[in-house]
Amino acid sequence: MRIDEQHGVRVLLLDLEGARISTPDDAADLVGSAWSHQAELVAVPVERLDPKFFRLKTGIAGEITQKLVNYRIRLAVVGDISDVVAKSDALRDFVRESNRGGQLWFVADEAELAARLVAPRPVGDAAPGS
C-alpha cells in the first residue's frame, strides 16, 4: 500500500496484490489502516474485492461501504467493472448513484480518481473534521 496526497486529500491506495476484501472485518482493517495513515479515502483495486461485492443481494457491498462511512472514510473502487455492470441493472444503478455522491466512487483508474478529487463535493459530504 502507499499513501498519496491528491488535491488536499490523503489517499490510502491498496496494492493490486493482497488478500481479498470480503467481510465487515476486512473493512474494519481498512479503517484501521486509513486511520493509522491519517487517510480520508481508501482506494481499492477491483481485483481485491470479493466477486460477491458486486452481487448486491449478498449485502457485502453495503456492509463494507457502511463500515467505512461510519468512520468517515471514503471508498474508491479502482478498475474496470464494465463486465459486471453490464450483467446487472441494479448494480449499474448502484454505481451511478454512488458516483453522484462523495462517499463511494467507482473509477476506471487513478487518473479518474484524481480528477474526482478536484471536483467540488456534493452538498452534505463534508470533509472529516469539518
Question: Can you say where each PLM-predicted feature lies in the sequence?
Answer:
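Amphipathic, Lys/Arg-enriched alpha-helical "gate/interface" segment within cytosolic domains
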Residues: 2-130
